[in-house]
Amino acid sequence: MDYQKDIIVIDKLGVVPTDSEVEYLAHLLCLGGTCRYRFNERDFELHAGDLSIIRKRKLIEKTEPSDDFRCKIIYAKPGFIDLCTPQSNYGMKGSLALFLNPVMHLTPEQQIVCRRDFDLLERRIADTEHRFYRETLVNAMQAAILDFFDFHARIYGESDISTQNASIMNRFLKMLEAGTY
C-alpha cells in the first residue's frame, strides 16, 4: 500500500475531482468564507468552523464556494479509512448520519482539535523518512477519526448499535452508495 497516495491533505477545492476514477472520502474543515453544495439531492452550506465529511463524493453537485472561501481537506481512500477506523459500532451510526447530513457545526474548542488533527496528518504524510511511517500515519488518522466520532456524538447524541445491526447497516449503506436498491 502506497500510503502517500492513500491520504492527501490540501487547502483548496478541485484538486481531486469528484468524478475521479479513484474514490476518496473527503473531510473538509471550512476555515473562512462559505461554500454551498448539493449532496444526496439536498443543499448544504459550510461556514467557518464547520466540518463536512463526505463518504461518496460522486453524490456532490453544484459546488459554489464564496470568493473568500478557505479550507483544509483530507482526502483518504476507503481502504485506508477502513484500516484506521477503530473497532467501534459508532462508526456505522456516524456513517449513516453523515450520509443524511455531512455537515457538523463545531464549537471553537472542537475547531482547535480538528485543525490540530489536520496539521498532524499533514506533517506525518510529509515525514516519509520516519522509521515507523506507516504506523504513525495510521495512528494520526485513527486519532482524527476518534475526534470526528466524538464531535458527532456530542452534537447529535450517542446511541448503542449492536455489532449485528452495525454489520447489516454497513452492507445496506454500501448498497445505497453503489446504487443497487
Language-model segment annotations:
Residues 89-97, 142-153:
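Short, charged, low-hydrophobicity "junction" segments
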Residues 26, 113-120, 140, 144-147:
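Amphipathic, well-ordered alpha-helical segments in soluble domains
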Residues 15-22, 62-65, 160-161:
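Short histidine-centered beta-strand/loop micro-motifs
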Residues 52, 56-62, 81-82:
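Histidine-centered metal-chelating micro-motifs
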Residues 106, 128-136, 148-181:
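Short, Lys/Arg-enriched, Trp-marked, Pro/Gly-tolerant hinge/linker segments that flank
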Residues 1-52, 57:
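Generic protein-terminus/edge-of-domain signal
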Residues 65-127:
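A hydrophobic/aromatic-rich effector-binding and dimerization subdomain
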Residues 36-38, 60-67:
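Short beta-strand His + acidic residue motifs that chelate non-heme Fe in jelly-roll/DSBH
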